[in-house]
Amino acid sequence: MQEPGTPTEPDPAPITFERNPDDYLHWDLTFDPPIAYLSMNVDPGGATLGDYELKLNSYDIGVDIELASAVRRIRLEHPEVRCVVLMSAIQGTFCAGANIRMLAASSHAHKVNFCKFTNETRLEIEEASARSGLRFLAAINGACSGGGYELAMACDHLLLVDDSASAVSLPELPLLGVLPGTGGLTRLTDKRHVRRDRADMFATKPEGVRGREAVEWGLVDELAPISDFDESVRQRALALAATSDRDADAEPIMVPEMDPTIDGDTHRYRNVTAEHDRPNRSIDVTVHSDARPDWPLRTALELDDLLCHLRFNEPSVATIVLHARGSIDDVLAHDDQLANPANHAARETSLLWARVLSRLDLTARSLIATIEPGSCFAGILAELSLAADRTYMLEGTFEDDADHLPAAEVLLTPVNTGPMPMANGITRLRSRLWGDDTAHGEALDAVGQRLDAEAAESLGLV
């Protein structure tokens, strides 16, 4: 028991998720269109959470936040880039994976959210290639183990230096007695189609596999001699860039600063507000509609920043109550560009929304949506109510409402029928009505109709 008057340890500073490339501590980002070079150069003394040393390009959450920032900025701000080379600035070392001392000292909640965040970043790399035409090349110039190999496997092509020493490995099982935590085994078998017996053997070899054997087993795609490694990387990157459909002449989308205002228990962005109800371990998150052209991009970025903040800095929050306030017409003004993106800006904004909604799905809190007079759960914001575990809609109006707001309505649009898939590849509408094809068909027939509470309930939407 602590004696009265004994100084207490200050609460750790909250983890923040906005990063400017000029302030990156662990990554060097350079451009030689159509190629961007993203070089891992982890500062050993730049730990985010403690006094552990980030040796051998090992990473913690701060390193991966910068990686996520770099990938997002390349996608949005640099349409001229068609291939990203992930590489290392440390000779003989690509990446040693997640820092073991950091993991040992972290809470269980942090470990879970850390692994979840890092995998979401790798999923974004894969999605950028599959849906945005941005290719990724892993230039493996040295030892590549654990999470480092998981990062490399997220790329389209793995080029390993052939120096008789550099190897790829997943040493978690033999050295730590745990399975790889960021999709390593799944990518090994389901993505790279490594034969099962080889995958089993690989996962028990802490020294890993190198050279021609790594190519034969399908662990990497190509070898390059150390004397010609840099040129081999460039030529392979150019070949990958040639397969991209990105519009090099498109207007860049500059990432705005979020700059949230925090006043006690209120977290306020321009379009998103969060208010804590700490006694009940809940938080009210309100998305406000706006007809301004930058609303879709900015709102997605704000909601994403808030979700990351809640995951890492607010572990006591058990329930997120979702609100959407404003005009349905304002939301619909952005609907077509999200459902049918016709240019770089629209495509990247639509894909960003899909990723943010997936992060909401996987945030591991109870989600409740409340649809009331003044709500605007339509189109992209209807995805919030479809993501919720429980959705409640007020029938009629509040008797004591001084503003005399009209009764709440819900409106499904083409955005809700395919462009925003969940992580499992199906829509939230299909997931909500899973196993009932008749109900799903009736909901699709109601696309474009403004639904009151009775109609929404009859369709299974609330």
What does each of the following model-derived ranges do?
Residues 49-50, 57, 301:
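ABC transporter nucleotide-binding domains
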Residues 105-106, 171-174, 186, 198-200, ...:
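Short beta-alpha connecting loops at secondary-structure transitions
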Residues 169-200, 208-212:
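Mobile "lid/hinge" segments at catalytic clefts and subdomain interfaces of large enzymes
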Residues 1-47, 150-154, 193-295, 331, ...:
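Amphipathic alpha-helical segments at domain termini/boundaries
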Residues 113:
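Active-site-proximal segments of catalytic enzyme domains
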Residues 33-40, 60-109, 119-139, 161-165, ...:
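A structural preference for short, pocket-lining loop segments at secondary-structure junctions
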Residues 73, 120, 187, 213, ...:
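Alpha-helical scaffold segments in soluble metabolic enzymes
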Residues 89-90, 125-176, 202-203, 207-208, ...:
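Glycine-rich beta-to-alpha active-site loop
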